[in-house]
Amino acid sequence: MERLAGRIILLSGVSRAFVGFLAGLLAVLAQPPFGIFAAAFVSFPVLVWLIDGVAPDPSDGAFRRLRQPAAIGWSFGFGYFLGGLWWLGNALLVEADAFAWAIPLAVVGLPAVLGVFYALAVVIARCLWSDGWGRIAALALGFGIAEWLRGFVFTGFPWNAIGYAAMPMPLMMQSASVVNLSTINMLAVFVFAAPALIWTGKGARTGLAIAVALFTAHIAFGFYRLAQPAPPSAAPQMAVRVVQPVIDQAKKLDDRERASIFEDHLSLTAAPVQGGGKRPDIVVWPETSIPFILTDNPDALARIAEVLKDGQILVAGAVRAEDAGAGLPSRYYNSVYVIDDRGQIIGAADKVHLVPFGEYLPYEDLLTSWGLSSIAASMPGGFSAARMRPVLTLPGGRRLYPMICYEAIFADEVDANARLADVLLNVTNDAWFGDTPGPRQHFHQAQLRAVETGIPMIRAANTGISAVVDARGVLVLVLGYNYRGVLDTILPGKLPTLTDVPTRSRIFWLSMAILSIVASFSRFGFNIRKN
């Protein structure tokens, strides 16, 4: 292995970039649907050795010195995001005549842009690089900053954050009940990269001991938490039905199919409970499951009232229209409705974080001013964003915290209001992406929100994956991808919050400060030894 490390260190130019690309591609195997945890313990040591091989000319300026580490980081990131996001092209094949031209932008262009974040990570690390275990701290710091930025820069896209690779199953998710994802991102990189010290690093014992301690604590806390009794359901118990209709996206876009789609949802809602279980108190439909503007269709509300039993509540994804007034065109929102057994809409919540290029076109006015109005006109979407995400209170007092579609991937946006809720609600339509890794990755990220908040989650997805998840991230019931049917169960209870949002933020900044100090002292000492 030492010989292999030496060969990687000596690589340069295209060969170095290609190995970086392969290392990033390998790291994807640690994410769903593969969950091969060990892959990250190979890819990150390779990245360390590639950075070890950077030997800039002392006469070069600062910019030229950073080109090599930037190229390494970008190639690693490009491989990682290309391997993890290629399935986005499927969404553009649904209406291929209109959007096939954009497939290269989604499949290659987006990974190329996201690779810049990992280029920044490696540049930061290289600035604090040394020959000891401090360089592992520097790499963890760099990735911690990069992943934090990826969560909000240009509207944010923290999909497949490195930390998720360290949490492939509920046993390994429990640390998220104490620290936030940003902290886990940093510590995961430290642990993943630590094996590089075995063959190429001074002070290996210290670095490896810290990595082993972190990994052991991560696993031990998981065993401890899962060994505790499952949180009991709050009284009175609430029976939940989750509907997964499995409707092809092309069919959903066909206006002629609207009535049959609506009736399909109603038939699943009315299906008898298997095994003589309790009749559902709440029925949940996926995102945009109501295929028309509900407020313009009183007959549809009447049909819902016919199907719902006394006291039942329907929570359904729908497009909501709002009159803008003054002769302006209506505004449309991707929403969740709460509908009672009389067919009355008694609550609604609109999506706050819209999908760029899917639900709206970023910088549309700027593109139009540049003469690119044809591009703006060809893009899908046209939704407006809500300013806040309310907690929906149901009859009886139960409270839902709604997250529509990919809002569930933004861990930092699940605010203090979520702690007021009794259940997290995630409705989505992943039919756009087909039977690919995308829906599995999406589900895995949503599952973590239950662990972070200590609140159970109801997830309704058109084609899957639908589930009821308890407050520890354990699956109570699940319907896999493309399985049509319903889930009937009793809503699990909440768990006490171990740390609040401000405390987790402080832990993140403290961890970043510690890594900065370790890396800086290691670098400072390294420079003294060189001189």
Swiss-Prot record:
Enzyme Commission number: 2.3.1.269
Chief site of localization: membrane
Cross-referenced InterPro entries: Apolipo_AcylTrfase (IPR004563), C-N_Hydrolase (IPR003010), C-N_Hydrolase_sf (IPR036526), LNT_N (IPR045378)
BP-aspect Gene Ontology terms: lipoprotein biosynthetic process
Domain of life (superkingdom): Bacteria
Matching Pfam families: CN_hydrolase, LNT_N
Residue ranges of the TM segments: 8-28, 34-54, 69-89, 105-125, 136-156, 178-198, 207-227, 507-527
CN hydrolase domain residues: 243-493
Membrane topology category: Multi-pass membrane protein
Pathway participation: Protein modification; lipoprotein biosynthesis (N-acyl transfer)
Gene Ontology molecular function, alphabetical: N-acyltransferase activity
Places the protein is found: Cell inner membrane
This protein's UniProt keywords: Acyltransferase, Cell inner membrane, Cell membrane, Membrane, Transferase, Transmembrane, Transmembrane helix
Gene Ontology CC entries for this record: plasma membrane
Function: Catalyzes the phospholipid dependent N-acylation of the N-terminal cysteine of apolipoprotein, the last step in lipoprotein maturation.
The protein's name in its UniProt record: Apolipoprotein N-acyltransferase
